[in-house]
From Swiss-Prot:
Gene3D superfamilies: Penicillin V Acylase, Chain A
Species assigned in the record: Streptococcus pyogenes serotype M6 (strain ATCC BAA-946 / MGAS10394)
Species lineage: Bacteria, Bacillati, Bacillota, Bacilli, Lactobacillales
A Gene Ontology biological process term: proteolysis
EC top class named in words: hydrolase
GO molecular function: cysteine-type exopeptidase activity; dipeptidase activity
UniProt feature coiled coil, ranges: none
Name of the protein in question: Probable dipeptidase B
Gene: pepDB
Top-level taxon of origin: Bacteria
Length: 499
């Protein structure tokens, strides 16, 4: 068993980082199918909160619910009736359900995929008119209530809208839901206001923790779902803003753009399109971005691992500190910013959705990194799996050598603490594994897609076996990498190993 410790220096960096970024969590993205090299729709999110926060990956099986049974969120008191029958779905929950389940993302058996949420918050003027509701719908309940209940992405958006209208929202959030017909992007703006759009196939978007919707045609009922008073509330709050004579949602509902959202919006757009005209000084970044470039799954992975490569910025967690967790100089702070790939990332997921993949398989593949993908792999999972590897299910809140999350967390800590000796050795090997899996996945998906037509049970068993075998083999390799890093890490002046 490896004795896991974090050196004082690393702890100071992480502490300073956490204090400066306590309200910054998650970065989402969407790449429309017309902008991808293989015609797939790409969408995903990094889930950020804090270092050393265990995440599981599980499948919640289908079940019938007794009449009157309710979902109960122990973190804020929200309750909602369960459907008569709950569909099977995959989930990425926390391990402390009394503080919120946070199922976060997954496929359900009907082919609906969901990522929930990117947190955001309305400005003070809006909140005075339509405040958030303490026991309303929150991120902690979102996927757990929606995924087992809906057959289409639009149904999911409509159910969220119904709940927010009737019971209120506990917080501002951005949610994405997708199926074979495309992807919906939804902003829950205030206590009872929301706007959702069917995302265009020829656009891309990067969205950290602020609202992004500009002008939306509320009369386009086929592609828009919105609360009735979204404009009225902004006018009443006296925060209503028009651009080119039209109501601009983000400018009306947002507080001023903060540096962490600026840095991730800017670097995310530039990661995908270095020729984009956006600048670091922009006061607002529009949701719908255009480009003449096309993108691959690897580009999406690169986006979620972005640490300002090619830009005149350095990651905030690399600041020189004074020994007390504070920057040595304000001049240094000016050159540093908050990256998409930061120490607070707990997991990252990418949905790769294709028209020719049956809904029974989720309509695509979820590429999942439990733990930050900075030095950890994305593994592919189809939507029909019924089981996950045991290392994904360890519930410890501190280091556990049998846990996937804690193993990856330790590897990331070691590489971050010792960049000179370890360099890019780990991530280079990880990318090699991913390249192999990407090359193999189309063949695997085709075989299981063909099988599901004639024998759904056999298709599920095959998907389970392939994913379990891959996860087991990969976890053994991660344990070997971890052990090698521990053995090779530099020693301090007293000859003791530092972690």
């Amino acid at each position: 068993m490896i004795n896991k410790k974090i050196s004082l220096g690393v702890l100071s960096i992480l502490t300073a980082f956490s204090l400066q970024s306590v309200s910054y969590a998650c970065t989402g993205f969407i790449i429309g199918k017309d902008l991808t090299k293989d015609g797939s729709l790409l969408x995903g999110r990094t889930e950020d909160l804090e270092p050393h926060h265990n995440k599981n990956f599980i499948v919640r099986l289908a079940k019938d619910n007794p009449a009157g049974e309710k979902w109960k969120d122990l973190s804020n008191g929200f309750e909602y009736p369960l459907p008569e029958h709950s569909y099977r779905y995959s989930a990425i929950p926390d391990v402390t359900p009394n503080k919120g389940v946070y199922d976060e993302a997954g496929f359900n058996e009907c082919g609906v995929s969901m990522s929930a949420t990117v947190s955001a918050s309305a400005n003070d003027a809006i909140q005075k008119i339509d405040p958030y509701v303490k026991n309303g719908l929150a991120e902690s309940s979102m996927a757990s209530v929606i995924l087992p209940s809906v057959k289409t992405a639009r149904e999911g958006v409509a159910l969220i809208a119904k709940i927010v209208t009737e019971k209120g929202a506990a917080e501002g959030n951005i949610v994405t839901l997708a199926d074979k017909d495309g992807i919906w992007y939804m902003e829950i703006l205030s206590g009872h206001q929301y706007v959702a759009i069917k995302f265009p196939d020829d656009k891309y978007a990067v969205f950290p923790n602020t609202f992004y919707l500009g002008h939306v045609d509320f009369n386009d009922k086929e592609n828009t779902i919105a609360s009735e008073d979204v404009e009225k509330v902004a006018k009443k709050a006296k925060s209503y803003i028009e651009v080119d004579g039209k109501f601009h949602i983000a400018k009306s509902y947002n507080p001023p753009l903060n540096d962490a959202n600026r840095s991730r919006s800017f670097s995310g757009i530039k990661s995908l399109d270095p020729d984009s005209k956006v600048t670091y000084k922009d006061s607002n970044y529009e949701l719908l971005q255009s480009t003449d470039k096309t993108f691959s799954l690897e580009d999406a992975m690169k986006l979620q691992r972005n640490r300002f490569e090619g830009l005149d910025l350095k990651p905030l967690d690399q600041m020189a500190l004074d020994g007390k967790g504070k920057p040595k100089s304000k001049k240094a702070v000016k050159g540093y910013a908050y990256p998409i790939s930061n120490p607070n990332v707990m997991e990252a997921h990418i949905f790769q959705l294709k028209k020719d993949i049956p809904a029974e398989l989720g309509g695509g593949v979820m590429w999942l990194s439990i733990g930050s993908p900075r030095n950890a792999p994305y593994l592919p999972y189809l939507g029909n799996i019924s089981r996950t590897y045991e290392a994904y299910q360890e519930k410890s809140t501190q280091y556990n050598d049998k846990s996937w999350y804690w193993t990856v967390s330790h590897i990331n800590d070691l590489v971050a603490a010792h960049p000179k000796p370890f360099g890019t050795k780990v991530i280079d090997e990880i990318k090699g594994l991913e390249k192999t899996w990407i090359a193999e996945q189309d063949k695997t998906t085709k075989e299981i897609s063909d099988l599901v037509v004639s024998d759904p049970k056999a298709a599920q068993e095959k998907a389970d076996k392939i994913s379990l075998d891959r996860a087991e083999k990969t976890f053994k390799r991660l344990k070997a990498i971890e052990a090698k890093l521990v053995k090779e890490k530099p020693k301090n002046k007293k000859g003791l190993n530092r972690s």
